[in-house]
From Swiss-Prot:
Belongs to the ETF alpha-subunit/FixB family. This is Protein FixB. GO terms for biological process: carnitine metabolic process; fatty acid beta-oxidation using acyl-CoA dehydrogenase. It comes from the Bacteria. HAMAP family: FixB (MF_01056). Heterodimer of FixA and FixB. PANTHER family: ELECTRON TRANSFER FLAVOPROTEIN ALPHA, PROTEIN FIXB-RELATED. The gene is fixB. SMART domains: ETF. Required for anaerobic carnitine reduction. May bring reductant to CaiA.
Length: 313
């Protein structure tokens, strides 16, 4: 048996749902999708869900992860085994841990390849900071996986598809984190997974203010703006959702223009599938040039305005 009887899918990020659904179609006979609203439910059916389970009734101050209890109960009620697919977002990994505990299931994060043999999942993902690929065969009846972006192609919606919709009512967990305040995200929504052209900045850009130079280039060529992990996590110059690398975005654009990025393996794992890599770095010995199809050795702060002017013509 090279498929599971059932797969359960949930994505806190709508843009990641199509690829998870495509993976679900390849890995199981019946697809169940947890959703948060009717619009997501309709989308899930068009993407191939046989059953949609609408999570309902959560108080505003509670976190989405607090649905883990009723999600696990629903999964157990409909089969003694199964596969759970989640995106490798922060929330996806938090939910994976909670579901793994409740289902007594093995959890594997950042999966880049998933296959099924004899009813058991085999998962490959990067280990040792991207220096090697580890393979795990999951022996527990339930398997909970968080999937790296780009692992599966996006499923295409089909408006003629039909499916059944059910409601899963909120049940307060015995122990939970309560949200006491929220802060609106300052950036516009970003969908880097689908971008044809990506301009990505590293700490070599020099300062947060200099990122505006990369933004101007993006406007000139119709590209999306991304960054390296240090820019997002250490310097806090850009949002977490934009960083490319082993533990976040894995991109496959037509062009990846790396600006001031050294090219460490942990970053390049997320960019090396690009059709063309163009690097700008003032260090001629930077590892990025080993991956680049084209490169310019020089100061990005001086090069970007000239490049933008030339490409905007």
């Amino acid at each position: 048996m090279n498929t599971f009887s059932q797969v359960w899918v949930f994505s806190d990020t709508p843009s990641r749902l199509p690829e998870l659904m495509n993976g679900a179609q390849a890995l199981a006979n019946q697809i169940n999708t947890f959703v948060l609203n009717d619009a997501d439910g309709a989308q899930a059916i068009q993407l191939g869900a046989n059953h949609v389970w609408k999570l309902s009734g959560k108080p505003d101050e509670r976190m989405i992860e607090d649905y883990a209890g009723v999600m696990a109960d629903t999964i157990r009620q409909h089969g003694a085994d199964g596969l759970v697919l989640l995106p490798n977002t922060r929330r996806g990994k938090l939910l994976a841990a909670k579901l793994g505990y409740r289902l007594k299931a093995a959890v594997s994060n950042d999966a880049s390849t998933v296959s099924v043999q004899d009813g058991k999942a085999t998962v490959k993902h990067m280990v040792y900071g991207g220096l090697a690929i580890g393979e795990e065969r999951i022996a527990t009846p339930y398997a909970v996986l968080t999937i790296s972006s780009g692992t599966f192609d996006a499923a295409q919606p089909d408006a003629s598809r039909t499916g059944e919709t059910h409601t899963v009512e909120w049940q307060a967990p015995a122990v939970a984190i309560t949200r006491t305040a929220t802060q609106a995200r300052q950036s516009n929504s970003v969908d880097l997974d689908k971008a044809r052209l990506v301009v990505s900045v590293g700490r070599g850009i020099g300062s947060k203010e200099n990122i505006a130079l990369a933004e101007q280039l993006c406007k000139a060529i119709g590209a999306e703006l991304a960054c390296s992990r240090p820019v997002a996590e250490n310097e806090k110059w850009m949002e977490h959702e934009r960083y490319v690398g082993i533990s976040n975005l894995m991109l496959k654009p037509e062009l990846y223009l790396a600006v001031g990025i050294s090219g460490q393996i942990q970053h390049m794992v997320g960019a090396n599938a690009s059709q063309t890599i163009f690097a700008i770095n003032k260090d001629k010995n930077a590892p990025i040039f080993q991956y680049a199809d084209y490169g310019i050795v020089g100061d990005a702060v001086k090069i970007l305005p000239a490049l933008t002017a030339a490409l905007a013509r």
